[in-house]
Amino acid sequence: MQDITNGRCGWCGTDELYMKYHDEEWGKTVTDDKTLFEFLVLESAQAGLSWITILKKREGYRKAFCNFDAAQVAQMTDEDVERLMHFDGIVKNRLKIKSTITNAKLFLAIQKEFGSFYNYTLSFFPDRNPIINHFQSLSEIPVSSPESDAMSKDMKKRGFKFFGSTICYAHLQASGFINDHLTDCICRNQKQ
């Protein structure tokens, strides 16, 4: 894989959906809890799969999980799980579907405790600011960080599923808490 493809971080390749995601979302700071919940759902679903697989099913996940409304997802029942096991728009993994419902309940508890999931996430960053890395090569980008290690450890302790340090790091990248756009990427100097 090339470090830079068409001026972008090489991981997004030339797939139009992937490039659009890279250009318009990945690494942009997200402060909205609904969007943070969306990324949490999608990143958790990605465990063991490629991100493009989940990205292509994003609209299916949106329909399946109440437009990513955590309060509604938290109310889902075993009947909803059975229904979603037959829904073509998502990866049909019972454990991941059930964990999404559990994670929604825990997400709401964190909002109550910290005022927002955004505030909770910032609590793992010593100066409460996003990290902007200056990597020149994809091989320099780590799969985890002290922040993702601490956050995933705390989330696991709270009962979250499918959210280990690597998934947490991907979540932090996606939502702009860690900016890993390569220094030569076209998105590098854009306003976040």
Report residues per predicted region.
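HhH-family (HhH-GPD) DNA N-glycosylase catalytic core used in base-excision repair
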Residues: 1-192
